[in-house]
């Protein structure tokens, strides 16, 4: 049992290191070829890549569906709408619970989908943005504290915590100043 746990943890480390590494290499390779062909082509491709990294519109659209459902259609429809953006059971949520779930999701996804990617793109361009998204996506997929992923996804979850630390501090500090 102990060996199995250790083996899962080691395999999780390998995955958590390889995925962002491969993502960075592929992204840098594509950009290097584009910039080699023509600097304008490189700039256009990198701009498109950076745009694709940011998750602004879908977050707004889905959260507004929750708002309109609460306002116009009632709690059952709002539960359905909020279930599309949260990873928890929404079947027993009241109006307050639905609102809280939506606000928490918007706040977290603003950090994960906008603030942190912008932070990494500011310093490392599209490569930094894609590497960040690879780490963040791994956490979303295997960073759970359940029997299946507890040991395998632990390193990916910690890695996500580390890469989000500075952007999150900047985001919360700026929000507190408002």
Locate each region found by the language model.
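N-terminal transmembrane signal-anchor/hairpin module of polytopic inner-membrane proteins
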Residues: 1-2, 6-33
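Conserved small/polar residues in nucleotide/adenosyl-binding loops
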Residues: 3-7, 171-178
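Juxtamembrane "helix exit" motif at the C-terminal ends of alpha-helical transmembrane segments
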Residues: 23-39, 119-132
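Polar-ligand-bearing catalytic/cofactor-coordination segments
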Residues: 58-111, 115-126, 137-147, 154, ...
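Hydrophobic alpha-helical membrane-embedded segments
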Residues: 41-67
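Membrane-water interface at transmembrane helix exits
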Residues: 27, 31-35, 51, 67, ...
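Divalent-cation-assisted or electrostatically stabilized phosphate/pyrophosphate-binding catalytic cores
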Residues: 147-169, 173
């Amino acid at each position: 049992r102990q060996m199995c746990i250790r083996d899962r943890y080691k395999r999780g480390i390998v995955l958590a290191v390889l995925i962002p590494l491969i993502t960075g290499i592929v992204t840098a390779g594509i950009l290097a070829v584009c910039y080699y062909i023509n600097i304008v082509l490189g700039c256009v491709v990198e701009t498109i890549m950076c745009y694709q990294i940011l998750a602004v519109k879908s977050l707004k659209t889905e959260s507004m569906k929750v708002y309109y459902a609460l306002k116009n259609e009632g709690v059952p429809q709002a539960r359905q709408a909020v279930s599309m953006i949260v990873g928890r059971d929404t079947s027993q949520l009241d109006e307050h619970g639905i609102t809280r779930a939506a606000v928490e999701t918007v706040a977290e996804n603003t950090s994960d989908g906008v603030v942190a990617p912008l932070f990494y793109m500011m310093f490392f361009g599209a490569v930094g943005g894609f590497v960040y998204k690879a780490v963040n996506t791994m956490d979303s997929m295997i960073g759970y504290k359940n029997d299946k992923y507890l040991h395998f996804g632990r390193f990916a979850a910690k890695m996500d915590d580390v890469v989000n630390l500075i952007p999150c501090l900047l985001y919360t500090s700026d929000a507190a100043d408002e």
